[in-house]
Amino acid sequence: MNVNELRSRAASQEQDPCTLSNYRGFEVVQSSLDLNVSFEKKNVSGTVTYELKNLKSTTEVVLDTSFLDIEQAFVDEKAVDFKLEARKEPFGSPLVIKLANVVEKLKISIKFATTENCSALQFIDKEATDSKVCDYLFSQCQAIHARSLFPCFDTPAVKSPYSFHVKSPSYTLMSGRPVECSEENTYRFEQPIPIPSYLVAIASGNLAGAPIGPRSTVYTEPPNLKACQWEFEKDMENFLVVAEDLIYKYEWLKYDALILPSSFPYGGMENPNITFATPTLISKDRSQVKVMAHELAHSWSGNLVTNCTWEHFWLNEGWTVYLERRILGGVASYEAKQRGEKDYVDAGEKVRHFAAILGWNDLVDTVKTIPSQYTRLVWDLKTVTPDDAFSKIPYEKGFSFLFYLETVLGGTDEFDPFMKHYFKKYRYKSLDSYQFIDTLYEFFEPKGKKDVLDSVDWNTWLYGEGVPPFTPKYDTRLADECYHLRDKWAAYEQNKGQFSASDIEHFEVNQHLLFLGTLTELFSNKKPAPEVYEELRKVYHQYSEASNCEIIASWNDLLLKSENFKPSDKIVQNFATWLGTVGRMKFARPGYKLLKDYVDKDLAIATFRKFESRYHPICKAMVRKDLGLDS
């Protein structure tokens, strides 16, 4: 496929293969959800209403559903017949509503209820919550799970404003702006900014909030509130200010966060107005607050400007990682300036480049471990779901693409005006990779940079497998200490007796992760004697005592890949127990693979069986595949 042949299109011609709906036939003017949460039945029921414009004189409305009970359908408030077609794996069951009259404007309503097979929801019994006061519910609709919560055009190509009305016995949050409501156990929200279905979110439980900035509140269960507030209150407003300077004003008004129970499968989910986040961020050292910078960046990349299909997911995540690192660098620069450092801009760039080095290492590792077809920037998802293809590729290869473009186009001074132009041009819209490239030409050609863009190997970047066709030149000053210590361990025989806990005492968290990650890679290529691993454990005992999940995961990855441990060993048992406390797939999936591949497959399966009920449906399904339990 030639990328240049697909450029110069006002609207994307990409057909989303992950939806069974006829979304191209309609414009959604307004969406409304009227919901009822039942903790007794463990379901959500209600009515969804769409105000539509018929764009092509279409004679039927086809919506996505997955394991939903459909009770009734209405067209312009009149009950009509509907057909729920046979399930078409893995994308669900199309709901077909025939239109007796073809009119330009119409209103469709569907009464529905979720079932026990709903992949978007997790109900948690109160005994399993931290406060043990009441049951808990939360949703995760990305990528194509909204269709299991309510009938919808479940594609990022379709965006509309939403109104939410919810009845629940417990405090409820949704992805909109709260509206005052006097009805008991009733909550209302408005989302005036058009969003796709995957950004619809709900959480209900024993929740309390505390300020973490002038326009930000953190919510969580009351026993955890003070810890969550401390973790984020230092940085949240700084992140917002730097992001606004980079792009343009934050227009969602409030940026709030909900710290969920441990079964939440992701680091964070960028639900508008209320980021859902994992409790693994509460590390008591503010080292994981970078995830909040990432989710905040989604307020522009992903939420305002959206990939039109999941095949172009890198447009969401590559841009977001790029912005995240610019935000982290900007905050570091600001703090250096406050300390009176003269070269404060350089201080910020060091931080940005160090984060990029970690990302590049993750990218190289990921390429080695996933099917090659998923290492492309633009995926083919005709027969698989986005969850099957999900990895760090769209994040880190996408970032590398943007960093490469920044580099060849003349650095941030040249790239930043384009960035602002891009996010203004596609605000409230969805686009594909070819429109992105066309916008580069539109912006830079008048500036005399057409030859630079013509020299880019677009086809290899978008469709090539493996690592990118580009070796980045990052500032390695913060990384060099880590590399030096790694190299010292590589020459263990010459340096025996020269290691001590003080080697790593001054490291910040990301330096620990780089040291452990590069040492793991080194030892994977040339495995040292068991004595080396014993010395590591003895000298760097602080790693064994860590409470930071990133360090726990990296440390165990290093040790267990030695294949020196049996299932009965304490280190293995401790790691297996820890897996039962983390539902975040970043840790759960590689953790179970680690047990399976380097310790004992039966232990991995037994551990998963033991903790399976604690995990979110998405995590549970992916770990089952990883362990070969679905074959």
Swiss-Prot record:
It catalyses: an epoxide + H2O = an ethanediol. It holds the Pfam family Peptidase_M1. Binds 1 zinc ion per subunit. GO terms for cellular component: cytosol; nucleus. The active site is at E295, Y395. Its cofactor is Zn(2+). SUPFAM superfamilies: ARM repeat (SSF48371), Leukotriene A4 hydrolase N-terminal domain (SSF63737), Metalloproteases ('zincins'), catalytic domain (SSF55486). One of its GO terms (biological process) is proteolysis. Its main location: cytoplasm. It is found in: Cytoplasm; Nucleus. InterPro entries: Aminopeptidase_N-like_N, Aminopeptidase_N-like_N_sf, ARM-type_fold, LTA4H, LTA4H_cat, M1_LTA-4_hydro/amino_C_sf, M1_LTA4H, Peptidase_M1. Zn(2+) binds at H294, H298, E317. Its EC number is 3.4.11.-, 3.3.2.10. Belongs to the peptidase M1 family. Aminopeptidase that preferentially cleaves di- and tripeptides. Also has low epoxide hydrolase activity (in vitro). Can hydrolyze the epoxide leukotriene LTA(4) but it forms preferentially 5,6-dihydroxy-7,9,11,14-eicosatetraenoic acid rather than the cytokine leukotriene B(4) as the product compared to the homologous mammalian enzyme (in vitro). This is Leucine aminopeptidase 2-2.
